[in-house]
């Protein structure tokens, strides 16, 4: 979930809700009632707001052109609310060139210049270490990732969830990279595990690595570990592939059950 204060800062808005809240979905009513709903599926809470800047013909003309053949609904599952697709649906195939960032970009941004570091090999992996501050970066060509570890004994785990998010965002901002297509995806363990993914046409991309575009872990003793995929979406290219038909959420859940996968093994399901 994301604090509404981040929404206010990102979009320059002020949500007058009476008290701070967190959310992970925003739903806009398309019946021109000018109602919006911030949904927190973790806490089963909905905050209703009035939208004051959408009452223009252009907005509703655009809304009328949105696809209506992909229905979604919220339902309770495993003690929490989950977004589900009640019917099978089709998604188009999008094709993009994939660029790969130079791992040394991360080394320079997070550790400093190479002449300050020791460089060693661990099999196929390259390890850059700054012994002065207990930080290192491991480049893994097999997974096409770099992993930054900060074990400075002065580090402390922030006590509040919002401050853990602040720490993660500050870490990402050090890179000074173009992350326009990268979005917050999920947090677990009270913000000690935070994942960001690249999004295309509103859907997350899963190919980048085992843990998304960016995955940050904060340990109880303050150690920080962040893994970055070197792969990034480039320019779009034409695709002649047919649309892919995806099953309903209920069908997916049944297939997982039949395959022996326990419901406790996953938190939610989303297409991408």
What function would you assign to each model-found segment?
Residues 2-5, 9, 13-17, 107-141, ...:
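Exposed beta-strand-loop-beta-strand "reactive/processing" segments of non-cytosolic proteins
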